[in-house]
Amino acid sequence: MRLILIFFVVFIGFLSCSKSTNSSIVNNTTTPPPTTIAKQLVFTGSGFANNGNYPKVYTCDSSGFSPGLQWSNAPAGTTSYAITMHHFPPTYPTEDKHVYLVLYNIPSTVTSLTDNSKSIGAFGINTVDRKNSYTPPCSQGPGAKVYILTLYALNAAPTISVSSAQVTMDVLLSGMRNKILDSTVMTVTYTR
């Protein structure tokens, strides 16, 4: 009988500890803090977006003027933007990339460019006609060609130590080193 009584007391003690532990866990449970999702640059074009088709109007098969572009969600501290557009030919790396647009010193207050915009920012040179302007893609041969537009949010103006007639995409990228707060890529396709 004594053995049964000891067993009963131990059993009741075990249940009471177990119950107390469970309520303590429930009372001490906290809700994790909400997750903060960082803003990311959003970059689109007039009539096209990432992984879309590049409109004919912006190529040499039509008017060939520069595309309208829009962006939002710049990180804090952005003082200016830069935009490049290029593609890699099938013979890359034997043949260098083709650059169609090098545009920098776009004020942080600007969040869009209209079609054929020529008065905002500073143009570097393209590799097609070596002019300080946009030049339209003029894809050679059949099949889809992929073009890459990149938007850069900068915390300071690029360090450019050459004349504007010598600012290539590579010169600009070098001048933006350690000044890029964020960047985003828009890849588009054009088929002749």
Regions flagged by a language model, labelled:
Residues 18-192:
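N-terminus-centered regions that define maturation/targeting leaders and the start
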Residues 13-17:
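C-terminal motif of bacterial Sec signal peptides marking the signal peptidase cleavage site
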Residues 1-4, 18-19:
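Positively charged n-region of N-terminal signal peptides that target proteins for export
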